Amino acid sequence: MKKNNIILNDNEIDISKSDPNSSLLDWIRLEKQLHGTKEGCAEGDCGACSILLSPVNGGKLRPANSCLLKLGQVVGSSVYTVEGLGSKKLPSPIQKSLTKYGGSQCGFCTPGFVIAITSLLNHKEKPTEIDIHDALAGNLCRCTGYRPIVEAIEKIDGDIPSIFSIASTICLLYTSDAADEHTG
């Protein structure tokens, strides 16, 4: 990976012409035109702006609040938005289950829940109800309530695609390239 790049939904992107001080959320929505990631509270409390982020050091992907991060902070990282996890034509098992079992009404908060659930299920194959509640603690929903969301998670059918090993490999390659660049 090049020095001023990030991986966004498996695509390497040069961000050298973007403002490193803009919020990651604004960059995702305004420059990349990915509107699944939303601004709810702009304080990191609601989960509407959630993305999956893998640090440069190759650590595991974790949910992060894109409204609290500057674009310059994620150089060398892998970032996944809800668009990188599924689509209208090919929804992920999580998206299918939320739709099928009434885990979404207006849909504003749904992308954040999909991010949180994806992270949970990639770290824990058979989560308990307590695990599910813990994973969803940073997400707010004003319409559906939480019971249908939890029930939809418990009924997910199908393999959850693991994007974690791919992102870790990409980040390790970036770290190696950066080390080579500095050591000549």
Give the location of each predicted region:
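Signature of N-terminal electron-transfer/Fe-S-associated modules in redox systems
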Residues: 1-176
